[in-house]
UniProtKB/Swiss-Prot annotation:
Family annotation (Gene3D superfamilies): CRIB domain (3.90.810.10), Phosphorylase Kinase, domain 1 (3.30.200.20), Pleckstrin-homology domain (PH domain)/Phosphotyrosine-binding domain (PTB) (2.30.29.30), Transferase(Phosphotransferase) domain 1 (1.10.510.10)
Protein name: Serine/threonine-protein kinase shk2
A Pfam match: PBD
Keyword Methyltransferase: no
Gene Ontology MF terms in the entry: ATP binding; lipid binding; protein serine kinase activity; protein serine/threonine kinase activity
Catalytic center residues: 434
InterPro entries, alphabetized: CRIB_dom, CRIB_dom_sf, Kinase-like_dom_sf, PAK3-like, PAK_BD, PH-like_dom_sf, PH_domain, Prot_kinase_dom
Residue sites binding ATP per the record: 315-323, 343
Record family assignment: Belongs to the protein kinase superfamily. STE Ser/Thr protein kinase family. STE20 subfamily.
Native source organism of the sequence: Schizosaccharomyces pombe (strain 972 / ATCC 24843) (Fission yeast)
Domain called CRIB: residue spans: 129-142
Biological role: Forms an activated complex with GTP-bound Ras-like cdc42. Participates in Ras-dependent morphological control and mating response pathways.
């Protein structure tokens, strides 16, 4: 039956329709409590979700609804701590000047809770009226009569104009726009000497890392030199292959490969490069560099690495160095490894050498079947750092995703092994901070390991939260984009985004420019699947456990390892088919 509510035709299921499930998306028993009447007990109600409304009935046989909410009036759906399996709805009241009210709904189990939340939030978002709303006065952003942005710093206006964020979105969600601009501008205005950098690189390229590599054609890498702000237009899965690195002049510098550096690793001959005299502005940093360099010397092998390794060819390249395949020679004992991956880093290009030291230390200490094995490291002429690690000959998960459609059993296996590695790190108070398919490697046997510890951080007893902005934005948790304190659960969010990669071949918002992607993460929170009907309830439940906005309710790695979805993981050997299928298509040995 159709009723007109505030001029909008609303479908309210009748008892007859309810019995026949006509027009009903979902229905079921819930326990209800209104926020404004917290002193009253929870009451049992029959909840019915239709295409554009949510109705509450006294019972499953009631003829008419006690309360009907328009989905477009629902402002937020979130977990609540009032009961174990409980969520809260925030909505506009139709009787009290459209003020925001709330109610809490409790259900039988966790999966049912997430299913209700997913169905309501996705349909509420789709039913929003597209007309602009008045901007919030506490956020100083607006548009004047001539269509110009007002109330923003000039630099932010330039960023906004370069992005694909619309003026209507600025009016509707000014807070999310401010958060995105503030986050992005801080990366432009801050050098890597004072903040950890982050990357909009969406390719399997090693960055300022000592541990990751991929099998790529280096000649296909794009060079990017842009002054000011560049509007990015991403139209295909083949993503930009350049890490954005910025200085105070807002210049995005290209990666220029040092030819002498390449020659040195391929031939074993190292060319000395004159070191510029220290200026007053860099003296204190150089002192820190010397200290880090001294510690590096103490932690590496002093012998000439050329005696032990026969470098074959380049595997991958990043903004800070290259990764090479090498054969172990000269009687060097590296356990079962006869082939290794060598990451060569030019330390003169690294403004924060202590980060490299931290990365090596974490990797050396993180001995686990699901973490790439660190083998050795060498410092050549106090400039080139060679980090030797096990060679994962099947490449990255990104390569697999691009060539093959994964089954849920295969996704479960990859999630299980990745969760084990994450749990190992979290148990030692280490956050990876850059979990994504690029940083999950496989070998020909189907073994799965986490790599790239360039962004990792340690938490202490006194400091169990961080606020630094690192990682790859498309995989970032909302609390990082909003610059709130965060902990180990940012890795769980990134794992959830990686699951969407495995389902849909790419993370959410990949085709958006970076500023708009940050805006959408801040605005939308939990992303929605493009075709949720093709995904099983068990996988959706696991995904929701990873992508809960409220970190209190977001699962830990240990909790995920007990989830029933992982019970359907295929044997490791079953991954061989997609590995060799991908190799056959790309002619990789």
């Amino acid at each position: 039956m159709l009723l007109s509510v505030r001029g909008v035709p609303v479908e309210i299921p009748s008892l007859k329709d309810t019995k026949k499930s006509k027009g009903i998306i979902r229905s079921g028993w819930v326990m209800l409590k209104e926020d404004k009447m917290k002193y009253l007990p929870w009451t049992k109600k029959w909840l019915v979700l239709s295409s554009n409304s949510l109705s509450i009935y006294k019972g499953s046989k009631s003829e008419s609804a006690q309360v009907t909410l328009l989905l477009k009036d629902i402002q937020k759906v979130e977990r609540s701590k009032s009961r174990t399996f409980c969520f809260k709805l925030r909505f506009k009241s139709s009787t009290k000047n459209f003020e925001i009210q709330a109610c809490e709904l409790s259900v039988a189990d966790n999966m049912e809770c997430y299913e209700w939340m997913d169905l309501i939030s996705s349909r509420a978002l789709a039913s929003k009226v597209s007309s602009p709303m008045n901007p919030k006065h506490q956020v100083h952003v607006g548009i004047d009569n001539e269509g110009n942005y007002v109330g923003l710093p000039k630099e932010w206006i330039l960023l906004l104009q370069s992005s694909s964020i619309t003026k209507q979105e600025c009016m509707e969600e000014p807070k999310a726009v401010i958060q995105a601009l503030d986050f992005y501008s801080k990366q432009l205005d801050t050098t890597s000497e004072t903040k950890d950098s982050f990357s909009f690189c969406k390719e399997t390229l090693p960055r300022s890392s000592t541990t990751s590599y991929s099998i790529r054609d280096a000649d296909k890498h794009h060079k990017l030199t842009t002054s000011g702000v560049t509007k990015m237009n991403i139209t295909e899965r083949c993503k930009p292959k350049t890490t954005i690195q910025t200085d105070k002049k807002h210049i995005i510098r290209p990666f220029i490969e040092d030819k002498s550096h390449v020659e040195s690793i391929m031939t074993g001959k190292v060319t000395k490069v004159p070191v510029k005299a220290d200026s007053k502005n860099t003296l204190s940093r150089r002192m820190t560099d010397r200290q880090a360099l001294a510690m590096l010397k103490d932690s590496v092998t002093s012998h000439d690495p050329v005696e032990y390794f026969n470098v074959k060819h380049k595997l991958g390249q990043g903004a800070s160095g290259s990764v090479y395949l090498a054969k172990v020679v000269g009687g060097k004992q590296l356990g079962i490894f006869d082939s290794v991956a060598i990451k060569s880093i030019d330390l003169q290009c690294q403004t924060r050498k202590e980060l490299i030291l931290n990365e090596i230390t974490v990797m050396r200490e993180s001995i686990h079947p699901n973490i790439v094995t660190y083998l050795d490291s060498f410092l050549v002429r106090e400039r080139h750092l060679w980090v030797v690690m096990e060679y994962m000959n099947a490449g990255s998960l990104t390569d697999i995703i691009e060539k093959s459609k994964l089954t849920e059993a295969q996704i479960a296996r990859i999630c299980l092994e990745t969760c084990k590695g994450i749990q190992h790190l979290h148990a030692r108070n280490i956050i990876h901070r850059d979990i994504k398919s690029d940083n999950v490697l496989l070998d020909n046997s189907g073994n799965i390991k986490i790599t790239d510890f360039g962004f990792c951080a340690r938490l202490s007893n006194r400091t169990n939260k961080r606020v630094t902005m690192v990682g790859t934005p498309y995989w970032m948790a909302p609390e990082v984009v909003k610059q709130n304190e965060y902990g180990t659960k940012v890795d769980i969010w990134s794992l959830g985004i990686m699951i969407i990669e495995m389902i849909e071949n790419e993370p959410p918002y990949l085709r958006e420019d970076p500023i708009r992607a940050l805006y959408l993460i801040a605005k939308n929170g939990t992303p929605t699947l493009k075709k949720p009907n093709l995904v099983s309830k068990n996988l959706k439940s696991f995904l929701n456990s990873c992508l809960t906005i409220d970190t209190i309710f977001r699962a830990t790695a240990a909790e995920l390892l007990t989830h029933s979805f992982l019970n359907q993981a295929c044997p490791t050997e079953d991954l061989k088919s997609i590995i060799f299928s991908r190799k056959a298509n790309t002619h990789i040995n």
